From Swiss-Prot:
It is found in: Cell inner membrane. The chain crosses the membrane at residues 25-45, 70-90, 101-121, 138-158, 193-213, 255-275. Belongs to the Lgt family. This is Phosphatidylglycerol--prolipoprotein diacylglyceryl transferase. The gene is lgt. The keyword Zinc does not apply. The keyword Methyltransferase does not apply. The lineage of its organism: Bacteria, Pseudomonadati, Pseudomonadota, Alphaproteobacteria, Hyphomicrobiales. Catalyzes the transfer of the diacylglyceryl group from phosphatidylglycerol to the sulfhydryl group of the N-terminal cysteine of a prolipoprotein, the first step in the formation of mature lipoproteins. It comes from Bartonella quintana (strain Toulouse) (Rochalimaea quintana).
Amino acid sequence: MNDLSCPAIAFPFFLDPVIIRLGPIALHWYGLGYVVGILFAWWYAQKLLKKHSLWNTNHPPMDKEKIGDFVVWSAISVVVGGRLGQVLVWDLAYYFNHPSAIIAVWDGGMSFHGGFIGIIIAMIWFARKNNINIRAMFDIVAAGAPIGIGIVRICNFINQELWGNITTLPWAICFPLDPYYLPRHPSQLYEAFMEGFLLFIILFIIIFAFKALKRPGTVAGTFMIGYAIARSISEVYRAPQEDPEWFSTLFHSTGFTYGMALSLPMLFFGIYLLLQAFKHKSTENGHPKRKN
């Protein structure tokens, strides 16, 4: 705990990253956040698959029972991909010197972009194995993903990681783990709102008001573009992380961050999916409708 006093303009942080301790076992908010996010995405996907009118020709691309089979694979892919991304992309030197810390996922340290790549691989594998249109599979998973992202960002806040730049705004937060104990932007909460709850509302609207699931790839494309934009905005308020040396050399003092760079492929892939979704006027769960 920092002994310095929090300035009057800011709120002192007081949340415990651990929900409850039972002897040597501790339940962390961070781990619970991932569980709740995945369970919500599972529940929401089942609801979408049951509502046949949302899909082209009133026929969902898969049975709702199938999404239950995918839950385990999605959880594994997100955790493994997220952790590997954190280790290899952000903190390789630290984990090289502290290899035992690699498995300590409950302490935080998960790369969103690594988890994204992990679940993309899992979705492609699962879709091909079960003869499901890949773009429709992307849509189903993307529809509920923002809620999980929002919850995990709140857990980042509770874990006192990824805090923001110094600010004099009235909602500034003093984090005890900050060695300078200065008032900072609660950038994790900005991300929770933009990448999570706002993006979910946008996807909800295009699904139910504009029937976006009838054009496979529309929901996933919108999600990827929306996340890339939201992440880039939030990077402005995040405290700088230690970027790879080659990146710092190329983009020193430009304001272009490594997080922004990692979001660019998502932006381009999202645009590609939208172009593919609107390439054909009539589609049947991702395949051009055949003429008789």
